[in-house]
């Protein structure tokens, strides 16, 4: 089987939506019966985004095999059925570290190690490895054409087009076509200059995706085709839409998938986008709406919680309701109190690190518990729920986590020093371990209690969910907390770690150590988020009586 490669680049400005465009195209090709995957190549020097600030980079998306990756991989998994792995994302930092390790080992036999050929060869090797077994691989190059950081990646894909063959490679370039209100027309010159920059590197784009706030007129697309040396049918208008799930249909309506299949000589049936049409219908025709408060510490950049926000929307789709998300800074809860939490139909506390804002999250968990408001805690959201219950119900005054107060009297949450990874191997950590790549990461099995709410929601006794944490419930202090009424609803596969807790005498209070948002998709949803949004709707109805 021959693998075909589509290299996706961006020009003029950043944040054009290369990831969404690539994922949408992949969704159409998958709907034609092709085996598709997507890769993201990031030009920064960090080995991975694991230690980067969420406010700078956005969320860290965790794959099944425990890789900490770019948030675009979350988009990929929400659009196609293929699960991402550590092969689907790598950075300049990882490439350089591998090449330097080989140099120290003597693998280059005394050669002068250079960007070309050693770095570019390493990039090509990773792309080829990630594409094995697939009909089509979309490779998104992070950054903007013209950035110095992206040059090794662009040179590598230029070489791949020669080595793999132009009949099995395509270059798709996203560019901005701005509308100038004063002139009353869109302007194509930025696109022309962006393509000129790409040509200077030796890359002739085969497809141009023209991003604009409106449809690009046919005469302007013809102009772009003429000056950029691209067939007119390969100049695609991609206007702003109110739902990203409309983009596959928008690309298909302009024949992009037909053009690609013809170019690669792929004989496959027409794309069936009925599942996406159903998603769009459910999104556009809700029968109600709920307001869910999300209390976190990175709310100035919603992308820090991208998968959680999308998962809540998916939960809304499964219940035919619109989910309005109110982002609340946990530090504001500390200073202003409960007034910020009034009027909510449900409360969610997502993951996070560090002491800042933690007391506000603990106060939020208490407010939800005492006022019978549906509550979903994720990762740190479970830990603060445990701390709150220990303090205010189990009588453990000033209970805390050793992450925040290392010498607290009741460390109900503590560092995990030993656990098994996704392959069953024993992992060990200490307070002196590096921060990067040292957490409990990836898919882990969880056993659900027969009498629990989550057992009913999932409908099966054993589930698999993805983790990203280094602190856990301290089993040494668990018995008195359980005696005070808290239910452990899920444990790790080896029965050693607490994975899910519930408050039994509460309408809906669930907190989990894992990250269910990473496996939620618009077509399938997720049991926890569907149940959470349903509970919010029921709470709203009770309040209205």
UniProtKB/Swiss-Prot annotation:
Amino-acid positions noted as binding Mg(2+) in the UniProt annotation, renumbered to this chain: 72, 140
Catalytic residues, chain numbering: 379, 515, 517
Superkingdom assignment: Bacteria
Protein residues bound to CTP: 14, 147-149, 187-192, 223
Keyword terms: ATP-binding, Glutamine amidotransferase, Ligase, Magnesium, Metal-binding, Nucleotide-binding, Pyrimidine biosynthesis
UniProt-listed Pfam families: CTP_synth_N, GATase
GO molecular function, one term: CTP synthase activity
Catalytic activity: UTP + L-glutamine + ATP + H2O = CTP + L-glutamate + ADP + phosphate + 2 H(+); L-glutamine + H2O = L-glutamate + NH4(+); UTP + NH4(+) + ATP = CTP + ADP + phosphate + 2 H(+)
Keyword Metal-binding annotated: yes
Activity regulation note: Allosterically activated by GTP, when glutamine is the substrate; GTP has no effect on the reaction when ammonia is the substrate. The allosteric effector GTP functions by stabilizing the protein conformation that binds the tetrahedral intermediate(s) formed during glutamine hydrolysis. Inhibited by the product CTP, via allosteric rather than competitive inhibition.
Gene Ontology CC terms: cytosol
GO annotation terms (biological process): 'de novo' CTP biosynthetic process; pyrimidine nucleobase biosynthetic process
Binding site for L-glutamine: 352, 380-383, 403, 470
Positions of ATP binding: 15-20, 72, 239-241
Pathway(s) where this gene product acts: Pyrimidine metabolism; CTP biosynthesis via de novo pathway; CTP from UDP: step 2/2
Domain Glutamine amidotransferase type-1: 291-542
Region (Amidoligase domain): 1-266
Quaternary structure annotation from Swiss-Prot or TrEMBL: Homotetramer.
Note: CTPSs have evolved a hybrid strategy for distinguishing between UTP and CTP. The overlapping regions of the product feedback inhibitory and substrate sites recognize a common feature in both compounds, the triphosphate moiety. To differentiate isosteric substrate and product pyrimidine rings, an additional pocket far from the expected kinase/ligase catalytic site, specifically recognizes the cytosine and ribose portions of the product inhibitor.
Function: Catalyzes the ATP-dependent amination of UTP to CTP with either L-glutamine or ammonia as the source of nitrogen. Regulates intracellular CTP levels through interactions with the four ribonucleotide triphosphates.
Protein name: CTP synthase
Organism: Cronobacter sakazakii (strain ATCC BAA-894) (Enterobacter sakazakii)
Lineage of the organism: Bacteria, Pseudomonadati, Pseudomonadota, Gammaproteobacteria, Enterobacterales
